[in-house]
A protein has these predicted regions:
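A glycosyltransferase accessory/donor-loop signature
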Residues: 1-97
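Residue-level preference for the first positions of well-ordered beta-strands
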Residues: 20, 188-190, 268-274
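Soluble, non-transmembrane catalytic domains of enzymes that act on hydrophobic metabolites at membranes
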Residues: 94-130
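Non-catalytic C-terminal accessory region of glycerolipid acyltransferases
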Residues: 99, 107-116, 255-388
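A transmembrane-helix-recognition feature enriched in membrane-embedded lipid enzymes
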Residues: 122-175, 233-241
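Helix-to-loop junction immediately C-terminal to a conserved catalytic motif
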Residues: 162-195
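Short gly/ser/thr-rich secondary-structure transition/capping motifs
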Residues: 170-177, 252-255, 310
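Catalytic core of membrane glycerolipid acyltransferases/transacylases, capturing the structured
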Residues: 183-251
Length: 388
């Protein structure tokens, strides 16, 4: 609220925290001499070319006009009170679950349709358009000084943002279970996680920071090409500068991607991969897994660390009319490649073990069997067709 503080009634924050003041109704310095916080307005007004004109407006404003303002203010206050008293006011409808975001409802309908059709690897939301990422545009290993500086600064911004969404209950981590499995790792690893929200990467960051590994191993993240090349604004900055590994439709860029992946894992760092490929908003079931994560691990002789996030409704109602989810992050035992098997055999075996672990966590946490509402029976592990 500090970015839009209305000068009316009780101010919602300390004066020194205010970023933007909004003078409303009978609290306008250009109409009244006794306005609260007017000194900030006049300090700014003095710096403009219309300062003298604003002063004339104040001097010429009549008591009759002020009386009319006060009456208008009283009417607005009464209207607000009448609305609050209504049984079917906006807030009550939202709390009763009768008024939910049209956008979210459409996404849920699309998820139900895609599940029925077995289209688990397809995204249900409009992603940014994908532009081909060129090799010269990406410094995967942050070898350049410019890349390192950008990453360091962006990480600080991201940390502030993460703290804020936790404080505002937009991200709620109820528990992290199994950090000892991450602590026990003695090499690089591919961390897998289900993908259901733009914030689940932040949840995994918190799990990583709760382990002893955060002081000696870096956490990288595989992301889609369009998120790196075309994602706008603040989130685009995070996508490009927070140890991300964007995939690419360019063959030469993918060679660079794979070489850098080998370097990261052999150096002893962690790579977060979403093997389901698609993101389905608040979808609780594990989806069929693609082979990419397990190929990275098997090729570099490092383990896969399966993580699965379960969800429960909190008592916090989001702006979209749905309850904010409380996350429990489950970190399972690492899955190691078998030195007696070929790479292809290890990819298949590790993928199937990961699928079994996620299925077990899902069924034990929710107390129900993993069943899909599909027109035809779907193999949970899925067909290993795509790289990630």
């Amino acid at each position: 609220q500090k970015w839009n503080v209305e000068v009316f009634g009780q101010i919602p924050c300390r004066e020194e925290e205010i970023c933007v003041l909004h003078y409303i109704m009978v609290s306008k310095p250009w109409h009244y001499n006794d306005c609260r916080l007017q000194e900030y307005f006049w300090e700014s007004a003095q710096k403009t070319s219309v300062y003298a004109e604003i002063r004339k407006v104040l001097e010429s404003y009549t008591d009759e006009e002020r009386k009319r303002d006060a009456e208008s203010c009283d009417r607005l206050m009464q209207t607000a009170k009448d609305e609050i008293a209504k049984e079917n006011n906006y807030l009550n409808l939202v709390k009763a679950g009768k008024l939910k975001s049209k956008d979210r409802l459409e996404v849920l309908e699309k998820i139900a349709l895609y599940e029925k059709e077995g289209r688990f690897g397809e995204d249900v939301e409009e992603d940014p358009p994908t532009r081909e990422l060129q090799p010269s545009e990406i410094d995967y290993l942050r070898k350049k000084l410019k890349s390192r500086i950008k990453t360091r600064l962006t990480y600080k911004v991201a940390r502030t943002f993460l703290n804020k969404i936790i404080e505002n209950k937009q991200l709620i981590i109820k528990d992290v279970i199994g950090t000892e499995h991450m602590d026990a790792l003695t090499s690089g690893a591919v961390i897998t996680c289900n993908h259901f929200n733009a914030f689940d990467s932040f949840a995994m960051q918190i799990a990583y920071e709760k382990s002893k590994q955060c002081k000696k191993r870096r956490l990288y993240r595989v992301i889609r090409e369009g998120n790196y090349t075309n994602f706008p604004g603040f989130y685009g900055m995070l996508m490009r500068n927070c140890y991300t590994f964007p995939l690419s439709s360019n063959r030469d860029t993918m060679k660079k991607f794979l070489s850098s992946m080998d370097t990261v894992l052999q150096h002893g760092d962690f790579m977060l991969v979403y093997p389901e490929q698609s993101m389905w908003w608040n979808y609780r079931k594990p989806k069929p897994l693609k082979k990419g994560a397990y190929t990275f691990a098997a090729k570099n002789h490092v383990p896969v660390l399966p993580c699965f996030i379960t969800m429960e409704d909190s008592d916090i109602l989001g702006d979209d009319g749905f309850y904010v989810q409380e996350y429990t992050i489950h970190i399972a035992e690492p899955i190691y490649p078998d030195p007696q098997k070929t790479q292809a055999e290890n990819v298949d075996a590790m993928r199937r073990k990961n699928a079994a672990v996620w299925k077990q966590i899902y069924e034990e946490f929710y107390g129900i069997p993993l069943v899909y509402d599909t027109a035809e029976a779907v193999q949970y592990v899925g067909k290993p067709t795509n790289i990630a």
